[in-house]
Every structure is written in structure tokens, then in C-alpha cells.
Amino acid sequence: MRRLTLALDAMGGDFGPAVTVPAALQALVSYPQLELLLVGNPAAIHSLLVKTDSVLLERLTVIPAESVITSDAKPSQAIRASRGTSMRVALELIRDGRAQACVSAGNTGALMGLAKLVLKPLDGIERPALMVVLPHKKQGKTVVLDLGANVACDGAMLAQFAVMGSVMAEHIVGVTNPRVALLNIGEEETKGLDPIQHAAVLLRDVQSINYIGYLEANELLTGKTDVLVCDGFVGNVTLKTMEGVIRVFLSLLKSSGESGRQGWLMQWVKRWMKRRLMRQFGQLNPDQYNGACLIGLRGTVIKSHGAANQRAFTAAIEQAMQAVERQIPERIAARLDAVLPKSD
């Protein structure tokens, strides 16, 4: 069994080691091939490992880091003062060959900038993108990018995202010849901002991309496309809106009461419908697909939600493992070399 070594930014996110350390231990229990490097304040980390089985501790190493980048820090300032922070040290472990991937729930802008600085983008990629795999109503999955790494994108960047998304759909989701669409305000060719229309022109000329045109946001979970491409501003707003609606819906299902004045048959029908709806919509629970992959780099970086709980952060660790096992950076590099001109 091939060993996998991941670096975890143990101090990042809203809850820091209180979430990342238990999630790390949960992952070690589930995956015997996994080794973890926990980066952060040794005292804070070790205090949560006191009762840990010594067998698990053999696959866990604490890497000291002097400080942490806070969630409210401006990315430019955070990057300038990043030496010795848990986020930067975790990324440097990939660069130095000690880890195969990094998982962080820290400041998104800082992670984006530091990852680009430390790991460097692949040839042919201007800027990496945040990507997530979302379930849809046809029991399949859709790759969506960018989700906030790049607020503004030109047409060439969107085309690069499409190529990377296609690779993810093939090797993570398992789709042959994945359909690619651009998120837009309408399906007509005349609709949309100039960068979207420019990207459409570029994608029509890439024979290895199965470009199907524009898709509106209300089709996000319908399964009409395997890859959905947009700029980071639109993608982030779309994802956060969807997550908020789903969380409210699930909470309403959980809290729906049953009137004692109803007959037993009606109560049974309501309970049956509630369980069925929970099963169907439970797969859309954001905790189950937590972890956006920052793709387009010479290494694997997973961005977890800052507010992730233990279950959600464990899901992000599993995403990192999958990306390493499927050799995603190498496959993206090979595809880019074949279909896109290299940037100057």
C-alpha cells in the first residue's frame, strides 16, 4: 500500500486545532496508508493528543510554526509577513518534498497567494482556481470552478479553467468526455460579459474539450453539465447561496414537528416522507463535500471552509488524498501541454 503524506495547517480556520487535530486523528484511523504532518503551535496541538493511541502517533508528526495568518488579514499583508506561519510552512513542506499535499482552512486570499508564490503555477496557467465537486439530482457530480480565487477573469483564464475542470471530471468523477459549460445569465450566444463570450470562442476551437455552451445558475444541480466554469466572484456567490438554502431546508426538515391530533397513518406518512427527503437532500449537505481544490499548481492544495467542523475537515483531508492518488497536477500539466499555448 502506497504511503501518502499530507501537511495540515493545524492553526487555520475558525476553530484551529480544536477541529483540525480530531479530524486528523479520524483520518488516521480510517486510512492506514496515511501519514500526517500537523503544522502549528506544538503546545496547542500536543494538548489534544494526550489520550491518543501510540500506534496512531507513529504516523503523526508535529511541525512547529511560530504564528498563524488570521481569517481577517488582508492577503497582501499576510503574504509579506508569512514566514514562519502555519500556512506557509505547510506549503513549503510540499515544495521541499516532505508532503504530497496541503490542507488548510485558513484565509483564502492568503492561501491563494502563498500557494502561487511557494509552489508556482503550471506552465500554461495564469492563476490557479478553486474547484469543488457538487452532487446533482441525477445521482452524478458536477465540477464547478472558480469559487473565489480570482474575482475577475479574462476569457483566456476561463478557458484554462475549463481544461483543468475537464481533467478533474475525468479522473476524480470518472466521466468520459465530460461536458463543459460556462455559467451565464442566459443560454443565447449573445448573452454575457465580454470575458465569457471570449472564453466561448476559445473553447469552441479546442477539439479535446466537449464544450456545450452557456448554462444558467438555476441549472447548477440538474446534471446538464459535468464541468461548470465561471469567475471567482460569481462562483463564490453561487456556492454560498446554494449552501445557505440547503442548510435552511435541512434544518426545517429536522425541526418539522408532528401533531398528536393526526391519525397514526398520517403521522407514519409524514415520517416516511421526512426520511426520504433527508436521504435525497442530505447528499447536498455542505459538510459532505467540504474542501475546494486549488488546481493549476505544481502541487496539491485543498482549501477547507473556515467554519468546517470535524467531519467536514476530514472530508477535505480525503479530497487531498484522492487528488494525490489520481495524480491530478501531473494530469493537468499533460493536458495543458497538449491543448493550450504556454503563457509567457
Curated annotation (Swiss-Prot):
Question: What are the subcellular locations of this protein?
Answer: Cytoplasm
MF terms (GO), sorted A to Z: phosphate:acyl-[acyl carrier protein] acyltransferase activity
Query: What is the uppermost EC class here?
Result: transferase
Reaction catalyzed: a fatty acyl-[ACP] + phosphate = an acyl phosphate + holo-[ACP]
Q: In which pathway does it act?
A: Lipid metabolism; phospholipid metabolism
Cellular component annotations (GO), alphabetically ordered: cytoplasm
What this protein is reported to do is described as: Catalyzes the reversible formation of acyl-phosphate (acyl-PO(4)) from acyl-[acyl-carrier-protein] (acyl-ACP). This enzyme utilizes acyl-ACP as fatty acyl donor, but not acyl-CoA.
Q: Which family does it belong to?
A: Belongs to the PlsX family.
Question: What is the protein name given in its UniProt record?
Answer: Phosphate acyltransferase
**What does the record give as the organism's lineage?**
Bacteria, Pseudomonadati, Pseudomonadota, Gammaproteobacteria, Enterobacterales
Task: Give the gene name.
Answer: plsX
